Amino acid sequence: MRRFFGTDGIRGLTNKVPMTAEVAMRVGMAAGAHFLRGDHKHRVVIGKDTRLSGYMLENALVAGFTSVGMDVVQVGPMPTPAIAMLTRSMRADLGVMISASHNPYQDNGIKLFGPDGYKLSDADEAAIERLLVEEPRLADATHIGRAKRIDDARGRYIHAVKQSLPQMVRLDGLRIVLDCANGAAYNSAPTVFWELGADVVAIGVEPNGTNINDKCGSTAPALLQETVVASGADIGIALDGDADRLIVVDEKGSIIDGDQIMGLIGASWARQGRLKGGGVVATVMSNLGLERFLEGQGLRLERTKVGDRHVLERMKEGGFNVGGEQSGHMILSDHATTGDGTLAALQLLAELVAAERPASELLHQFDPVPQLLKNVRFAGGKPLEDKQVLAAIAEGEAALNGRGRLVIRPSGTEPLIRVMAEGDDAGEVERVVDMICDAVRAAV
């Protein structure tokens, strides 16, 4: 069983194992040793979001990587997809992003990317886990790595993201409210939209180390909704702490989630002959309404386990180029190797410009069926193996059979059991979710 790696790298509470300086240094040693392949000069790119603990973890990782003979390029606060892009662009052996995504500042995490810009495979993560508990293979004094900061990384990323749009597409005349969650994109995303001609109202762009995702960003869109309406904006865009996801708000203040965005881009790209794979890849959490909408367009919805890495794996296997999650992760593999909120927003805005219709008309592609998600916290044990819980799940599945879906799973990042049900009958959906949640609480 893995001790450190979860569904999205290594994550935890700062200064508690595994998110300590000591563990971070050993991660640098282990990952560095694993990727010391060939006789070229080895290099790792390290970026971070704006959490206070990022400084501590960055220095620990630098010490670990250089101690085994790897050079380090430090790029400072940058979106997660920027690290993936820079890793490929700089021909680095490895990329590291220090972030806990949408979590509060007390948490932090370490995400690793291979030289191809994709998140590491299960096999690579397992190999690094093994090396973490072994005696590190340190370089001799003449082969210790060097660390260097570069100042133009932000400009490289901004240029690459803008290149995803055709040269003739401009955002002139659009007023956009952009919420950067006081996170990694605070100094890149506003520039992207401004350089393309938009009138940008930026919020969440004053990070202080402890205000990342604090009442702002994609998981707390109330401020964005209020600002869009108050400023008379055409659209609002909220990124999360590491800018790999987005949530959109139309000019009336209504929220558009990842399902609606996937539906719009998938259907539009299909009409343009740009869609690959004959459909869209999403997770088991995406709304049944999206599936029905795509079927009506002659497209299919491929479902995976929760997590953008599972979405990307299926996209690569099936030759798809559009995938994502209801939470706002958008993977557009013609342009990026991982989810990129800024890039996805540009593709969405290109559709808005071309349609010449209000966001409230264009972005509501379908009516979602009633869906309810509740979380039950547990301290330990295996509540999903409890007989009463299993009986409640079976009863819920029988009740929704043919009229909805039921998904019960443990969170990959927190001690939670997530219970989701959806169907045409909102009352029945709520009854099923509450019944299963009660059974889980009784079991723990």
Curated annotation (Swiss-Prot):
GO terms for biological process: carbohydrate metabolic process; peptidoglycan biosynthetic process; UDP-N-acetylglucosamine biosynthetic process. Binds 1 Mg(2+) ion per subunit. Belongs to the phosphohexose mutase family. Its EC number is 5.4.2.10. InterPro entries: A-D-PHexomutase_a/b/a-I (IPR005844), A-D-PHexomutase_a/b/a-I/II/III (IPR016055), A-D-PHexomutase_a/b/a-II (IPR005845), A-D-PHexomutase_a/b/a-III (IPR005846), A-D-PHexomutase_C (IPR005843), A-D-PHexomutase_C_sf (IPR036900), A-D-PHexomutase_CS (IPR016066), Alpha-D-phosphohexomutase_SF (IPR005841). The active site is at 101 (phosphoserine intermediate). Keywords: Isomerase, Magnesium, Metal-binding, Phosphoprotein. The lineage of its organism: Bacteria, Pseudomonadati, Pseudomonadota, Alphaproteobacteria, Sphingomonadales. This is Phosphoglucosamine mutase. Signal peptide: none annotated. GO terms for molecular function: magnesium ion binding; phosphoglucosamine mutase activity; phosphomannomutase activity. SUPFAM superfamilies: Phosphoglucomutase, C-terminal domain, Phosphoglucomutase, first 3 domains. Mg(2+) binds at residues 101, 240, 242, 244. The keyword Metal-binding applies. One of its GO terms (cellular component) is cytosol.
